Regions:
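Outer-membrane beta-barrel translocator domains and adjoining extracellular loop/strand segments
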Residues: 1-8, 61-67, 114-119, 159-165, ...
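Membrane-embedded beta-strand positions of outer-membrane beta-barrel proteins
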Residues: 48-50, 93, 104, 148-152, ...
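Outer-membrane beta-barrel "beta-signal"
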Residues: 248-261
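Short loop/turn motifs that connect adjacent beta-strands in outer-membrane beta-barrel proteins
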Residues: 41-47, 99, 138-148, 183-192, ...
Length: 261
């Protein structure tokens, strides 16, 4: 258990923990988590938010204890650890420019676990800037309406240099989500075609699933009947990037059925 959290560069194709004892895991406390938020809406209808939270990691980090043997590091025990007291602070805004809703957020995670060059999780500080927006188009020749959402991001590990981490100390990318809407195609039936594309342009930060050159493309078809029944199918393809892209084999088909009453 837990091998998926070891980067491929650390575990390699031949890495295994067979015969290595698992020691007692370090679970997170059930208490000590809290958060606060403050919002201010200006006269121009711009929403400005300030947030702060303290929480515990919801996914385990794998810690391996090594000993030197004939000049080689040999694993002698391992455990899963849930890091506590991760602090998050963020400032955000939401406004309207022309006919486009624009949002932005600058967030900083302090003492979040990240894998260093030894393969061990260490507490680091991660800053992330996100700018995005949503624009709605009216009827066209090939649709009744279109909603386009977009977002760009830049992340930087502010507390560590690239040489101290198993991957890079930065990452950047963008994503676009477009939904084509078709009204009353059949009596009582509306349809939509959701299309999602994500491209990690540069840099690798595995903890936020950003892999340089990696791409995700998802195309689906959804149907709605009288606002009660919904059915949909979508195919998602993961491609691009090099062997650091741990998501490259995750292609899948998703089928959803939903009824509201």
């Amino acid at each position: 258990p837990g091998l998926a959290f070891i980067p491929e560069e650390i575990r390699g194709n031949e890495f295994n923990l067979f015969g290595v004892p698992r020691t007692r895991d370090e679970d997170a406390s059930d208490s000590g988590q809290w958060g606060a938020a403050f919002h201010y809406v200006t006269e121009g209808n711009t929403d400005i938010g300030v947030y702060h939270a303290v929480g515990h990691d919801k996914k385990p980090s794998l810690e391996i204890t090594y000993e030197e043997l004939f000049g080689q590091r040999i694993p002698v025990s391992y455990r899963q650890r849930y890091f506590e007291d991760i602090r998050g602070t963020a400032v955000s805004f939401t406004t309207v420019i022309g006919e486009t809703n624009v949002t932005g957020e600058l967030s900083i995670l302090e003492d979040t676990p990240m894998v260093d060059t030894s393969g061990d999780p260490q507490r680091e500080d991660l800053a992330k800037l996100q700018i995005g927006g949503t624009h709605v188009l009216g009827p066209g020749a090939f649709w009744d309406d279109v909603t386009v959402s977009f977002e760009g991001f830049y992340a930087n590990v502010t507390s560590a240099a690239e040489r101290d981490l198993i991957a890079d100390d930065y990452a950047m990318g963008y994503s676009v989500f477009t939904t084509l809407g078709y009204k009353n195609v059949f009596p009582g039936w509306d349809f939509e075609v959701p299309i999602f594309f994500k491209h990690d342009v540069s840099g690798v930060i595995q903890e936020i699933q950003a892999y340089s050159g990696a791409k995700v493309l998802s195309v689906g078809l959804g149907g709605f009947y009288l606002n009660n029944f919904r059915a949909g199918i979508a195919y998602s393809a993961y491609f691009g990037g090099d062997r650091k892209n741990l998501l490259r084999d995750r292609d899948h088909i998703a089928v959803t059925l939903k009824y509201s009453f």
